[in-house]
Amino acid sequence: MGFHIYEIKARQIIDSRGNPTVEADVILEDGTYGRAAVPSGASTGINEAVELRDGDKSVYMGKGVLKAIENIKNIIAPELEGMSALNQVAIDRKMLELDGTPTKEKLGANAILAVSMATAKAAAKYLGLRPYQYLGAYKANILPTPMCNIINGGAHSDNSVDFQEFMIMPIGAKTFSEAIRMAAEVFHTLKGILSGKGYATSVGDEGGFAPNLKSNEEACEVIIEAIKKAGYEPGKDIAIALDPATSELYDPKTKKYVLKWSTKEELTSEQMVEYWAKWVEKYPIISIEDGMAEEDWDGWKKLTDKIGNKIQLVGDDLFVTNTSFLKKGIEMGVANSILIKVNQIGTLTETFEAVEMAKKAGYTAIVSHRSGETEDTTIADLVVALGTGQIKTGSLSRTDRIAKYNQLIRIEEELETTAEYHGKSVFYSIKQK
């Protein structure tokens, strides 16, 4: 029939930070093939699926992925060869069975995910479909509102800003292409403003600027200045989204949040909640990701009770794209949104299950890149297939980020009049003003 898996190849390639990562090719009997490369994160959740690294310090500083490659060639490939590529669930379940650990530490989530994504791409190609059409069927027509990273701090930079990502969301755009234009205009305007203030305009891992600003507040203020100067209204045309990555600031021993890159101030959970409540009043913020640490479930509950009806509260390190943690969050009434990172969980099937659970509970879902990316654009197709309406894939610079935006522009063009861009209405988990 031609749609059975004939061969699986795997290789070590380089990601956007110069570290090795896994790429896999799934080749079908008729010669059709799908190729996928996996990303990796800088700030990682303690409960994330395990990214298998070789640990040999004399090669790639211990970050080689040859063990994961060997696992694909020697363990995964012999079991999957001969299976139908059109049965994604069976393929993914077989790999989970072969691994047999909760965090995929035996075979490596990087090995499993590369094969999972490559299989879907091969199946789509075999059927003459785009990956978004194959994975999303008739529902795949919603283009996402992008979260564009424009200022980096914390673990993603070398400056005195505590919070990892300051992003803009073009919520007032009518189409995805217009959203990208608006974001790009603000990005270039911000560059001019930073340069005029004597700040460096070099970019961080995800393509945002990493200037040595004087405070966390200054980051919000220069972004608002850039939005206005570019001709847009903050909060109406373009809103701010944050990823403070507070797990990086949290000391589990003292249960305090330490603003270690700026004032060295120590805040209790209650004080951190008040901090965010003030910021939401002061700035046009629509979304905060990881506003509290992944171990601080009580703090998360307080934050959700305080501002969860005003803005989107996204669990990333908290949920690690895992249905068991998401279930706990839903039961406790913690957060109202989940960040979806395919490599945090390791298969497309589990990713779909997490999004399904979130939607049923009234939580939003955001498909996300990682700080170590490649030219692979699978997540662009995935966000349209899942219909989550939001994507987080970096700034308006660096090809590893732009590749995803360009793929979405192509998808929007291909969908023609059926393409929808929902802008602000994607935030169904909060009260709309």
From Swiss-Prot:
Pathway named in the protein's UniProt entry: Carbohydrate degradation; glycolysis; pyruvate from D-glyceraldehyde 3-phosphate: step 4/5
Gene Ontology cellular component annotations, sorted alphabetically: cell surface; extracellular region; phosphopyruvate hydratase complex
GO biological process annotation, one example: glycolytic process
Binding-site residues for (2R)-2-phosphoglycerate, renumbered to this chain: 164, 341, 370-371, 392
InterPro entries for this protein: Enolase (IPR000941), Enolase-like_C_sf (IPR036849), Enolase-like_N (IPR029017), Enolase_C (IPR020810), Enolase_CS (IPR020809), Enolase_N (IPR020811)
Comment on bound cofactor: Binds a second Mg(2+) ion via substrate during catalysis.
Cofactors named for this entry: Mg(2+)
Binding site for Mg(2+): 243, 289, 316
Catalytic reaction list: (2R)-2-phosphoglycerate = phosphoenolpyruvate + H2O
Enzyme Commission number(s) from the entry: 4.2.1.11
Residues forming the catalytic site: 206 (proton donor), 341 (proton acceptor)
GO molecular function: magnesium ion binding; phosphopyruvate hydratase activity
Main location: cytoplasm
Keywords: Cytoplasm, Glycolysis, Lyase, Magnesium, Metal-binding, Secreted
Subcellular location: Cytoplasm; Secreted; Cell surface
PANTHER family the UniProt entry points to: ENOLASE
Homology family: Belongs to the enolase family.
Summary of the function given for this chain in its UniProt record: Catalyzes the reversible conversion of 2-phosphoglycerate (2-PG) into phosphoenolpyruvate (PEP). It is essential for the degradation of carbohydrates via glycolysis.
Protein name stated in the entry: Enolase
